[in-house]
Amino acid sequence: MLAARIAGPGAGRDNGRVHVAVIGAGVTGLVAARELLRKGHEVEVLERWPDVAGQASAFDLGNGVHLDRYYHHLFESDRHMIDLHEELLPGQLEWFRSSVGMYARGRIWPFTTPRDLLSYSPLPLVDRLRLGIAVTRLTRRNDWERMDDIPAAEWLRRECGARAYDGVWLPLLLGKFGDDAQNVPLAWLWSKLTLRRKLEGRSAGRELLGYPRGSFRAICVALADDIRAQGGRIQVDREVLAIERDQDRWRLRVAGPGAYRAPAGTGPADPDLTRAVDAVVITAPTDAARDLAPWPDAFRMRLAEWTYRTAVVLLLELRRQYSGTYWVNVGESDVPFLGLVEHTNLVPAERYPARYLYVSNYVAADDPLTQLSTDALLAHYVRQLGVIAPDFREADVMRAWSFREAAAQPVPKLGNRARILPFATPLPRIYLANTTQIYPEDRGTNYSVRLGQQVAQAVGQTPA
């Protein structure tokens, strides 16, 4: 057992209870903390931001109505998150019929069902058929490991044809991955099309998406409440600056309140907040984890292999409906954003004070869009928003917010399986769990739940 291998104050207690610090109060960190408490460990969670939930965070629109900063939903195959809701928030997860569209040639085309594909006239019929056959063949495969070295772009161009590739896939790949689009493995696309969107039971032949009452933050608040009820501690507005050796334990240097307002890692450490622990679970992104601990050079280089795309999201509060579609992919390369998600076309608008539209983009970390103010971002997008929906007027915008997440999308590359890091790091009793480790699956709250469960299981199973 882990405790038997740990020396120093507070370790090796009679019942195997050890002091574990979890860095990050997003879904993965909270689930890991809860599971570790169930194993009988002493657990505290340290979060840089002044609230729990991480990338599942929300904000108050007024009168206690919360809305996600970044759009989320669940598929019926997302059993980890569904089961968690059934346990902690029974009856709060609801299912709604979805609609997907593709913007091309000046209009939004339905793009939800096979029938929609057959009616998608921006492509000649032969290309529609070819695209449908290729996707069907791909989703019936179960050998994703063999796809790890195959470029998705190359396969799509060959199997779907140049017109379907240029008109459907290329804008999506470029919008998602930019300069890395040509090196994204086919395994990633296979997972996107097969695992996350597997339809079960009542959703066969249509698409139902799940959304919890009160936003996705609600499940994080429920997790936090359960952690505290079990005796765990959650410290928000506490940024961990460094993990240092302290004989056979680990000492965490922690910044004081307000450090989140400064760039990560730059706040001064507060000596009163320094603490020694037996084990550490890091749920921060890989680029942030790279500078946290005294890693061996070879491991630090493996951490440095990972890059992320930054999410830039403009959220608009509208007087009236923008379009009749929940999720609109953009199939035109000259449009300055990747997609549109009209939340109130999924969840009934009556639950909110207005209509809400997310304008989504994924960009490189140094892209100028990451530096634009909310007003400047709206000004950059507003003309194209009117082109896509001709009835839209800038006067329809009542309020606007913008959000940026630097570690929104890990970038998979050819041969990505070899880049996946185990939960146990080379440093004894330090563990890593983040979205770079869920490949071939794409990032999502469901896989964050699974990650938290898996890393908690790994704690204590590896030699010190």
Question: Where are each of the predicted segments found?
Answer:
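Dinucleotide-binding Rossmann-like beta1-alpha1 core, especially the glycine-rich loop
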Residues: 63-144
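Mid-domain catalytic core of redox enzymes
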Residues: 39, 238-371, 375-392, 403, ...
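N-terminal Rossmann-like FAD-binding beta1-loop-alpha1 element of flavoenzymes
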Residues: 18-45
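Short FAD-binding loop at a beta-strand-to-alpha-helix junction that anchors the flavin cofactor
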Residues: 357-358, 423-441, 447, 451
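Extreme N-terminal leader/targeting segments of oxidoreductases
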Residues: 1-20, 38-39
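Glycine-rich FAD pyrophosphate-binding loop
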Residues: 37-62
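Internal hydrophobic alpha-helix adjacent to the cofactor/substrate pocket in enzyme cavities
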Residues: 449-464
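Active-site/ligand-binding neighborhood in enzyme catalytic cores
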Residues: 131-242, 246-249, 258, 276
